[in-house]
Amino acid sequence: MKFALLVTSIAALSAAPLSYIKDIQPIMNKQGCTSGPCHGGAKGKAGFKLSLRGYDPEFDYRAIMTDLSGRRFNRTEPEKSLVLLKPSMGVPHGGGLRFDTDSPHYKQILQWMKEGAAFGDPVAGTVTKLDVEPSEIFVPKAGPSRQMKIVAHYADGSERDVTNLTQYNSSVPQTSEVDEGGEVKTIRQGEAALLVRYEGKLSVVPVTVLAGKNGFAWSNPSENNYIDKHVNAKLARLRILPSELSSDAEFMRRVSFDLIGVPPTPAEIRAFVADKSDTAKKRSAMVDTLMARPEFVNHWSVKWGDLLQVSRTKLGEKGAWAFHEWIRDSLSSNKPYDKMVRELVTARGSTYLNPPANFFRFTAEPKVAMETSTQLFMGVRMTCAQCHDHPFEQWTQTQYYQLTAFFGKMAVKSGMDSEEGVVYDKREEFDIKHPKDGRVMNPKFLFANDKFNVRETELRESLADWLTARDNPYFAKAMANRMWSYFMGKGIIDPVDDIRASNPPSNAPLLEALTKDFLDHNFDVRHLIKTIVNSRTYQLSYKSNDWNGEDELNYSHALPRRLSAEQLYDAVQAATGSKRKLPEVPVEAKAQDFVDPHVAKGGFLDLFGRPERQTSCECERRTDVSLVQALNLLNGGTISDSIADPEGRIAKLLLKNVSNKDLVEELYLAALGRFPQAKEMTAANEYLAKGDRGEKAQDLMWALLNSNGFLFNQ
């Protein structure tokens, strides 16, 4: 049937002369000839180079018509053209058989050649939009298939069915897969995004497959704020029941790690659990208390230090300290996010006297400055567009260099001190040129904004105006999404620094609501944080139920997250009551106080994923679990020495001669942030009674510190 549709489509068009741009290039793209692993790679393949995904049709046309002395196109005997012989395996082809001589694709290319192999009108042949049917696939259970239909509209007013020439990809093939003809098969419960691409136009079709289980009844859970409203609306539609609310002890541990980076003390847990006032009110009050503590600034300084690459390797020791203190001051004063970013992007002068200028110590090259700024502050990855038009987004190579031009005059020179940098604007002209044709690229915003103009004498100020504008559709959204990921384990758009049409949000109304709230409160990050952690969604238990066990996308239950390196180190010290001495820092210092990754380098913190701060990507910090980490927890000195510390928690409890019950309870609260269950208490009491009480207590603490309950924030 699909073959017949394609034949019919070609026959209908046969009256009109075929052109490369409208009729042949789609075949090249569909067959993968222009893909990265094939001829669209940086160096092409087997001496034949095409533009990646056909972004430069004029280049590709010349490669076919004139390269190899025209051997790819045989004007007198078209059937002997390499462009036909290779993909049909008339001669050996490294890419294998792409189509046979009886296929519609072969016949269309042959007809085009016989008609003279015209390039065509690049304007009239431009695709202006795609009609995609269905626009959404939603099925009550796995099994049904759906056939896509894609109609392309062209600049000359014509349209055609391009279903069989369209490229399809499923983001989650385990949930739904799609064949070359656009037939979508639903495989199992879940959600996927069907990416539909045709000649530079892209559309995303959401695919939802329900579990197909009977007996679902929506529980109408209470809602603390608008977050819960948007989350619950989607859960109800997907027939997913959210988990129960976390216990007070679970909440206390979770929110403490998330807000201040360290666990609550046993005394704090006891007091919070004993408070019988309204749950929502007392939790909200605890959030306020934690955010007022100095550890709040310490913890979030670590996150911003990662993103802004605070490291003495790049900034020098004095520069790193200055930048670190500026970050701390910005967080402590709750500086509006837009103001903070503006100070970074427009910074000039000494990296010692004006700390935001350190931003350009690691982005001194204009292209790096542009790529880092857009990825960090807009969640947009422009790197692909440096060499070619972005294959999955609207950004072009020309736009890449126009945006880079805002940093064209910026430079960094040495200061009075050997490690000091001075950021300045060069007086002489420094042109950013397009690599394809050498054209000088004038600064131009990535998308138009009538409120702002490019001021030639204030290029970075002009960029900052546009970047931080309230109506910039990426700036506030990227930050709202990033902050959400810190508390929920993944972004609504994930990865958080890869916002594009082909990477849609898991809950678009929720992200829009968070963004609007952030804007309505004038880029107040603390308000955004409080809103998230006060939601019932954030406070749900990590324990799943019969209806949400498979869900890892819609926030129906908390996602356990491995503690960061700094959190884990500080949690070990808090649980054991030990004060380990590390080089360069005071005995009382926590890992969250460390300015850069050179403190205690090569030890526990690096093993558990502390980043070297070489990039501004969240991906540099590792939160995986490895065998080497497990062995360190089992046998490493950080754990064993802390447990056995003669001035640590266990030693002090033994000196007080507390009962076994109180000893076990204290160790559970210190390590896991909860009281032991009855069976755990019984087992621990029996173990303590079998030998040396001190050794048994250390064994118990060792077991707790090696459990998932300690390693993960859940």
Feature-to-residue mapping (PLM):
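Positively charged n-region of N-terminal signal peptides that target proteins for export
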Residues: 1-4
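Hydrophobic h-region of N-terminal signal peptides that target proteins for export
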Residues: 7-15
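Solvent-exposed helix-loop boundary motif
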Residues: 15-106, 123-151, 159-224, 252-254, ...
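Periplasmic/extracellular electron-transfer cofactor-ligation site
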Residues: 29-52, 114-122, 381-396, 539-540, ...
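Catalytic cores of secreted or luminal carbohydrate-active enzymes
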Residues: 99-119, 628-635, 639, 643-644
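Primarily short, surface-exposed interaction patches in extracytoplasmic proteins
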Residues: 219-295, 303-583, 619-620, 640-697, ...
